[in-house]
Amino acid sequence: MDTKTFTKKYYVDRKNTDCIKWDDKAAKGKLPMFIADMDFKTEDKINAALASRIKHGSYGYTFLPEDYYDTLNAWNKKRNNITYKKEAIRFSKGAVDAIIQIIHALTKEKDAILITTPVYPPFFGSVKTTKRTLVTSSLIRTNGLYTFNYEDIEKKFKEKKVKVLILCSPHNPLGRVWTKKELDKLFALTHKYHVLVISDEVHSDIIMSGHKFIPSLSFKKYENEIITITALSKTFSLAIFAHCHIVIPNKKLRDKFDKYQNEYHLASVNAFCAYPSYYGYKYGEEWLDSLNKVVEENYCYLCLRLGKYVDILPLEGTYLAFVDFKGYTKNAYKFLYEKCDLMATAGEKFDAKCATWARLNLATSLANVKKACDAIEKELKK
């Protein structure tokens, strides 16, 4: 499906639906390009299957469809050449919830946890709320791309006695899809220093042409030291259906995690929330391929219009563009909000040093991207 046809068929006006993105009081009168969800309806067959379940009218206790795991693995095998053993998969209501559960189950208070910055803000909170010790390592820019500062990471591993690394793959907000070489070098360090990796891969289906997502658990030699979190919440805009997978190949770690989940009654899966993912894995591939084309088209347009003024990071994955307005303002969020009537995500949320940066959500219509570019360019020309 071409981008125009997709947008015409699936773009939806979300105003007055209790939508955080469009109905937030702060977004009134502004073009919202902040929170990471889409302005597109999910795939028709997913909606139809859900409607059929609702029409039945009974919402008693149930379990997952018999072929749920086979359907999940068929998707993963086709798109990323990986499958996960059924016994290794656990569930949670979301990536952040999963990270917090893993930290509670497998570490102790004051244990050091490293995150690479700038990064998705809840990573910071997940360390602080669990009373662990936050350690950060700044990503470094080389030839226009941000990558890991391996020397600094190794230094922190040694000096801070780091127990866990939380990895964002693909990276939010930098849009990186880590290469096999980058990940192999990183995991060699985590292996050397006995650091557990929690790999948040919820954006892994949103990949631009010319790039290939590498699942962390595809490195078989390190799989016992890695826990992966996957979901279709970003893929098909299913955020209200709180459902994600936690893949734990290491049985000793899995047993500890199971003990924690069982102790706090967290082990059950909400089957109704799992259904949209199940239907997405079965029916959503063509829809997703079209969506990725829309995101890429929007990104190319953004670069064409604004690239001569501001620093726009290359977008390899996710539908989130990270833009530096340095030279025009000291605070990109305020500049966009007050001058351009546009609500973005403030760069300093990802790192205190990123106040001149803003994250823009491109999972919307090209018309909205054009409107945003018109407003921004008008101010940049002044």
Residue ranges and their predicted role:
Residues E201:
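Walker B catalytic acidic pair
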